[in-house]
Amino acid sequence: MARKKASLDFEQSLADLQALVERLENGELSLEESLAAFEQGIALTRDCQGALAQAEQKVQILLERDGELAAQPFDAEPDV
């Protein structure tokens, strides 16, 4: 259940961040509102980066647990 909650938290943070970016790009916010939105966006970005870093570590741990596989850095870019 904790894994599902963490996933939902990441998805919600990402959705909130996208909504903030749209509001900032519209240019309809006052300076103070823009600064507050920017500050919130920075916090959301850090949360998302932290969640992604944890996911990467879990992938490495899972690879290390299997005796036949060595830990390999997670590469989000597919080999083409």
Swiss-Prot record:
Gene3D superfamilies: Exonuclease VII, small subunit
Keyword entries, A-Z: Cytoplasm, Exonuclease, Hydrolase, Nuclease
GO cellular component, one term: cytosol
One Gene Ontology biological process: DNA catabolic process
Gene Ontology terms, MF aspect: exodeoxyribonuclease VII activity
Domain of life: Bacteria
Keyword Cell inner membrane: no
Localization per Swiss-Prot or TrEMBL: Cytoplasm
Entry EC number(s): 3.1.11.6
Catalysed reactions listed for this entry: Exonucleolytic cleavage in either 5'- to 3'- or 3'- to 5'-direction to yield nucleoside 5'-phosphates
InterPro entries, per the entry: Exonuc_VII_S, Exonuc_VII_ssu_sf
HAMAP family named in the record: Exonuc_7_S (MF_00337)
UniProt function note: Bidirectionally degrades single-stranded DNA into large acid-insoluble oligonucleotides, which are then degraded further into small acid-soluble oligonucleotides.
Subunit structure: Heterooligomer composed of large and small subunits.
NCBIfam families for the chain: PRK00977.1-4 (NF002140), xseB (TIGR01280)
The family this protein is said to belong to: Belongs to the XseB family.
Descriptive protein name: Exodeoxyribonuclease 7 small subunit
Phylogenetic classification of the source organism: Bacteria, Pseudomonadati, Pseudomonadota, Gammaproteobacteria, Pseudomonadales
Name of the coding gene: xseB
